[in-house]
Every structure is written in structure tokens, then in C-alpha cells.
Amino acid sequence: MNVLVFEDSRVDRLGVLTAARPACDLMIGASSLHDALAHLGHVQRVVRPHLARHIAGLAGRRITLWGGATPSLTTEPPASSHGATAIVVNARVVPSRRNIQSLRSLVETGHRGTVREHGTIAAAVLHLSADGSGPDHAAWNSLRDTGSTATLETLELMELDGSLDLLHEPHDVITAHEEAIEGSLAMLLDTGRFGETKPGLFVADGASVADQVVVRQGPVVVAAGAEIGPFVCLDGPAFIGSGARVNPHAWIRAATALGMACRAGGEIEATIMEPFSNKPHDGFLGHSHVGSWVNLAAGTITSNLKATYGPIRLHMMLPDGSRETIHTGRQFLGAMIGDFA
């Protein structure tokens, strides 16, 4: 199976969260869309020009700009995929368990067509010809080479049953994460790589969890190589990524996901920390998204609640330089911190 994940014109509305990474590489739940799609087959990214230049120069490197594993640089589909079903996925699709199951169902059914969300292509199933000819192959090549869905839009494709959730604004990342994390952890547990060492705590081989750790509710999933110090309080659902370290006396609260090699201390709630970021000291980080290569100093406190307890408005600068106020409808919303901040 060949998978093409593409960024459309609305990806810039996600703001600083996707300024230095593809939208498909945002961690939501315990996984990014790219990593979730990798279980379906060979994944190619179609990204904005500045990211495409970075990907093109990754030969020989182990880690991407955004802290993920180096992607395959192959531009042609694997030989086995010629003359087979292929799927195109919008990079703004939320990698929730329901969405991933829907995409898997589309692939297994193999019916040619599209799934749209308010008129926007969320996914399309194409039939690639064995000789590389035909309209589907032309649309595939056009999208891969130019990033434009124009040719894809001209195809006569039936509307397929099902729906897929898309990210629209920065705060959607937090909302989607809170809704997706439990199902995302369930998909990890289904792999059988995690053993339950105490009620609600699931630990991979090679991880280290001190005896004095308290798990008040699960599931808490700890990946290989992670380390959790003594006197830590864990409230699930939560994910501790590979090589991450939780310092003694920390409180990791529900809906928190720590990416690979993160360092965490103090109190963290309903927050995503992308790989290689640090908040190792006391302080509070809540309902936030922290990009890769970010270091939050000792005592850092993020406010996630208005003094009035009312809904939070988000003031955002758009790509054209204009400003817009977004009514998030959320009572709790913290910091949106991009990569390298």
C-alpha cells in the first residue's frame, strides 16, 4: 500500500505549531498522523516548500528538524504498489483511533472515491495503474510533485461513506488530543509490547519506573528507555515516550503525552511535549502544546484559565500579516509553543 499525505492551503492556520514541521508530524494522543499511517504502508509527505527543501537534504541524517525519525526519501511508489490501491490523506486529519480505523477500512474496501469534510478532501482512494498511466496516476503524480490537489479535484470520484476529523485552528490540537489519547493508548497496548506492572501502569521492556511511583488512574503507558523517578504521581490517560525522563516528585496529570527524550518535572496537565523538549523543574504547564527543541526554565508557569473563568479567545497572526481573534469556546487553554522557541 502506498500512502501520500499532503498539506493543503489551510495548514498555515495552525500557526507556530506547524511553522517548522509538517502538520502530519504533530503528536496528538500518543502518535503523529505520519507514524500512524506508516502501519498502512509506505508513506510519502507532500509539504510546504521550506520543509520540502529540508526533507530533500536529510540523506545521512538520523533526526529531522522537528525531532522525528528521518523519513524515506523515495519519491516513486514501491514496485509492488503499481497497479494497486493507494490512498491520499490530508495532513490535518486527526490521528485518533476512529480516524485511523476509518482510513484502514477505506484501504481494505478499496473502493475508488473521496471522503470530504465540509467540502475539503480529507482522504481519497485511487487505483494506480500497473503501467503508470491513467487519470488516477496523473492526479497522484501531480499532487506529489506540485502539492496541488487541482488534478485530484477533476477526477470523477464517488463520495465514500464515513467521516474524518480535521484540525482547523491551533486550539483544535489540544481538543483533539484530549479526545484521542485514550484510544491512541489502546492502539499501543494492542501491540502487546507493554506489560502491566501495577494497576493502570503499562511498561515496555527497557523502561525504568521507581517503586515509589503512584498511579492514581490509568492507563499510563511508558515506552522503552523511559525513566520515572521516585515519588511521582501519575494520572492517566498519559503517555511517556521512549527515552523520556520524569524527575522525582513530578505530577503528570491526565491527557499528558511526553515525546521521545523529553525531560519533565513539576506539574503537567493535558499537554503535548514534542520530542527533545525540556521542562525538568518545578512549575506548571497545562493544556499546552510544546514543540521540539524547547527548554522551559525553572519555575515556568503557564496560565490556562482566565480570571473570569470564561471562554478563552486566541489572538493570531495570519500568513498575510493580518490579525484575527478566534473564539475557542474552551475554558482551559495554555501556551502554543513552536519548535525551537
Positions of PLM-derived features:
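Short, conserved interaction/coordination micro-motifs, predominantly
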Residues: V209
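Terminal amphipathic alpha-helical/low-complexity segments used for targeting or macromolecular assembly
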Residues: M1-G200, D205-G206
